[in-house]
Amino acid sequence: MKRKTIMALILSVSMAASMTCAATAAFAEPEDAAETTDDAEATDDAEAADDAEATDDASAEDADQEAADKVAALIDAIYVQERTDDTDAQCTEAKEAWDALTDAQKELVEGEEASPEYFGRDTGDASKDDPRNQDEIGENELLVVSFGTSFNDSRAQDIKGIEDALQEAYPDWSVRRAFTAQIIINHVQARDDEHIDNMQQALDRAVANGVKNLVVQPTHLMHGAEYDEMTAAIEEYKDKFESVAIAEPMLGEVGEDATVINEDKEAVAKAITDEAVKTAGYDSMEAAAEDGTAFVFMGHGTSHTANVTYDQMQTQMENLGFTNAFIGTVEGEPEDTACDAVIAKVKDAGFKKVILRPLMVVAGDHANNDMAGDDDDSWKSMFEASGDFDSVDCQIEGLGRIDAVEQLYVEHTKAAIDSLTK
């Protein structure tokens, strides 16, 4: 009996121990499960935070792009050639919207015509210019008509330079300004708050001020499309003045073919080459030629019949003995003035150094971008890419700042004023 009691006691202790272990194990399993659950929850929280941050970033990027797109649309709305009753308000709205952007948002502005450069590019101090839109004109007005430029420094030096020379020469006449490019007028107004008259505004201003005698001096290079549009606009106002006269553009009469040149073309050829060699550090065109340097004068080009003027300027250079002077055009009209054609001419003539300079009244967008820009299709880049030249340099200066050219306009204006008394 005693032995059975002992065995029962041992069995009872063993069973109790087993039950204790089982209970311990049962309690241990939930502890491990809790740790796993905590880890999973922490991971989910981190992923949720990352997702939220990514969503916030995406939302911020969308908001930035939306703000930039709004400005681009406002710029495109004023990048037009027609002025409307809404133009002034649109110019103001576009500038205010641009100013409200962050620097990062400004870099995102991209539209059909819009880019960060529209408002962001530094083209000089607009306050140095004079829009010449004052009233109290008097009886005699000298209206200077230009295509225009949004480059502030060029506008002040080239266009204002001509206007100032005319005002000095004719103090009894009030010099006023008109631009024919509404796109440029809007750009300058929106960016710089400078208000320049278009043709209709300038002529309406003259009528409202009681002008009796109107002389119009275009700064255009030739009798091209811009000149034709200007004369058509003036024709509609002729009966509102006692007398009207239109002066010759810079290069005077066109002539029948490339061999026909005149004193105006000779004067301009001499003026631009004198300035070019001086800027380049040479004594003369001949000295530059001996040093292997060619000058390429880049005009705009036109499909108008007046494009023969460019060939006439090439003839004029040759008549002056300038074997290292070449005339080209941005538009490649006439065809022999296209960049590729000019590169071939300069190469065949044996010149290894090239200096590009605009054959334009103002050194504006064409001079800065089409001629001297860094893009692959600029003239500077194409001359360099040809591999035919040791150096390619640019002189970004318009014709309007050259004294001899300004005096040529003074002479043209004198002829127009004199015609009023004949």
Predicted features by range, described:
Residues S12-S18:
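Bacterial N-terminal signal peptides
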Residues A22, W98, V361:
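Short, glycine-/Ser/Thr-/acidic-enriched flexible segments
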Residues S18-E35:
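Sec-dependent signal peptide cleavage junction
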Residues M1-I10:
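Bacterial Sec-dependent N-terminal signal peptides
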Residues A60-T123:
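Beta-rich interaction/scaffold domains
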Residues E117-I355, M360-K422:
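Extended amphipathic ligand-handling, pore-lining, and cofactor/metal-binding catalytic surfaces
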Residues P30-D62, E117-Y118:
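Ser/Thr/Gly/Pro-rich low-complexity, disordered linker/stalk segments of secreted
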